Amino acid sequence: FKEWSDKDITNLVKHHRNHPSIVMWSIGNEIPEQWSQEGVQIAKHLQDICHQYDPSRPVTQGMDKAEDALKSGFAQVMDVPGFNYRVHKYYKNIEQLPQGFLLGSETASTVSSRGVYKFPVVVSDKATYPDGQCSSYDTEYCSWSNLPDDDWKMQDDYSWVIGEFVWTGYDYLGEPTPYDTYWPSRSSYFGICDLAGLPKDRYYMYRARWNEQQHTTHLLPH
């Protein structure tokens, strides 16, 4: 890290800074040094490099230990303080942020399998089934995460929640929560689309939310 971090950040920013899709830079995600003064100094240093080579864009990173990051001052030094999950803690977080706003840097982690519908329909953070699937009704999530509606309510009700990055757009190999020890489950259930890139039912919820120029109509079994 000491040998390559400055070079990597510099090359990253210089290579992509003219790309129109870049709205901010991220210097880390869930790093273990969130609680320490060493982490604060590293965050300041890497953020300064981003500012040096691109003064036009702010810098963020995703923090999963909100209490530690706020106590150490780690969150307070970021241009855009990003918090992963635990949306119910946003109220407490914002009280300690001089920036006056926060970002959902990793949100939702709702789990579902495309075309699989479980009955009875229940909201649960620990539902599992013998077939190793998750319900496509999008009522299931993890112990650390939440449903999309929780994120949207915070964004609608409080202007200091400036947006979100959803985990995740596509399913991927690895992290098969809630079936981490269940063979042959070997890929995630978090995706808005599945491994083949086909949209799950949740895709249409996000489309309706994000696409304000077109109507969204979607039918599913009940």
Q: For each predicted feature, which ranges?
A:
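Extended substrate-binding grooves/exosites of carbohydrate-active enzymes
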Residues: F1-H222
